[in-house]
Curated annotation (Swiss-Prot):
Ranges in a coiled coil: none
Keyword terms of this UniProt record: ATP-binding, Kinase, Magnesium, Nucleotide-binding, Purine salvage, Transferase
Major enzyme class: transferase
Function: Catalyzes the phosphorylation of guanosine and inosine to GMP and IMP, respectively. Can also use deoxyguanosine and xanthosine, but not adenosine, uridine, cytidine or deoxythymidine. Shows a strong preference for guanosine. dATP can serve as a phosphate donor as well as ATP. Shows weaker activity with UTP and CTP.
Gene3D superfamilies the record matches: 3.40.1190.20
Name of encoding gene: gsk
Name of the protein this chain belongs to: Guanosine-inosine kinase
Activity regulation comment: Guanosine and inosine kinase activities are both inhibited by ppGpp, a nucleotide messenger universally produced in bacteria following nutrient starvation. ppGpp binds to Gsk, and inhibits its activity by blocking conformational dynamics and inducing tetramerization. Inhibiting purine nucleotide synthesis is required during starvation to maintain levels of the metabolite 5'-phosphoribosyl-1'-diphosphate (pRpp), which is required for the synthesis of histidine and tryptophan.
Binding locations of GMP: 40-45, 93-97, 198
HAMAP family reported for this sequence: Gua_Ino_kinase
Disruption phenotype: Disruption of the gene causes a considerable amount of guanosine accumulation together with a slight increase in the inosine productivity.
Amino acid sequence: MKFPGKRKSKHYFPVNARDPLLQQFQPENETSAAWVVGIDQTLVDIEAKVDDEFIERYGLSAGHSLVIEDDVAEALYQELKQKNLITHQFAGGTIGNTMHNYSVLADDRSVLLGVMCSNIEIGSYAYRYLCNTSSRTDLNYLQGVDGPIGRCFTLIGESGERTFAISPGHMNQLRAESIPEDVIAGASALVLTSYLVRCKPGEPMPEATMKAIEYAKKYNVPVVLTLGTKFVIAENPQWWQQFLKDHVSILAMNEDEAEALTGESDPLLASDKALDWVDLVLCTAGPIGLYMAGFTEDEAKRKTQHPLLPGAIAEFNQYEFSRAMRHKDCQNPLRVYSHIAPYMGGPEKIMNTNGAGDGALAALLHDITANSYHRSNVPNSSKHKFTWLTYSSLAQVCKYANRVSYQVLNQHSPRLTRGLPEREDSLEESYWDR
């Protein structure tokens, strides 16, 4: 487990030098592992350059997103392959991206649950999915299906306009019996997306998702929900509010989804409102930066050394140096908030907005899992006087999430190819020392 964020001292966590005082508390075997588990609609993003006639011939609407049938998708895919029009085939899916990015950042195990083609041809989209996923992401629990996984075609027309064609394939065929109880029982978090409970009638995915939530509750594993798009939420915000209240501990969203859910256009007020239902909120707000909101134990609150920020809640970041806790673990819960502007003002040229939020969530998951890992290895540490949810303060998690988002915005793919550099030039040292 690599530890999140930067720390000034070189060894802030006793891993290599075994402290004799720790020996008595630690088993002789390998230090206990920590991991996260996520359920996804297994999806491959296929990008191709086509002419306008191609888009018309398949009955697609230029510049829009349409769901297409499996046979149309197969014909379309075969034609793209024969004519060599495919420019990129990436593993996609919100949770797949998040698990991959978590494994790259933490250099540790994540587990992905979902479906995968039983027969995989070399060079096919399913093969690409496996190739583009970190080797630290455990794919051993995927359920085999007889047919295609999900495919999202991005067809770039002559004018550069993007048209999307989505073929769900068998991606929603995950059955409840394919959810491994022991894997969820030992996890630091269960990560889900709102798309999982919104499927066609008769598809087993929602039932599998609820089964996973049931296991998570049984073993006190925090459930993390990332909101899909504002349209899914806007259909029935009250239903989602109740769903969050009943099942979810950590919520990740962008400012549009936040407004659809809460009716508040200010991301800070929306995050505050969401604390009525969940324990911790991560809200990315594009060029404004990102917000976090959570609870801490009043007795253990820590004042910020950063300038106090104005906002809809005055001086809202006053206690941003506090670590987050779940509401039920607090004796006297206090709401705490933090905000950070985009790292280095954001990239000069944004290559890709798809996945910046998944990157930020992966950073938060890394911090939460590092906390579980530290607690199981150094249980009597003063860092665990209270039952904290995060290893670092809200302000520090914001910095880390922000840095990872920047990395994703700066590249073509939503998946990181390597972890963050140990030391950086540029503004780095002054940035982390702030």
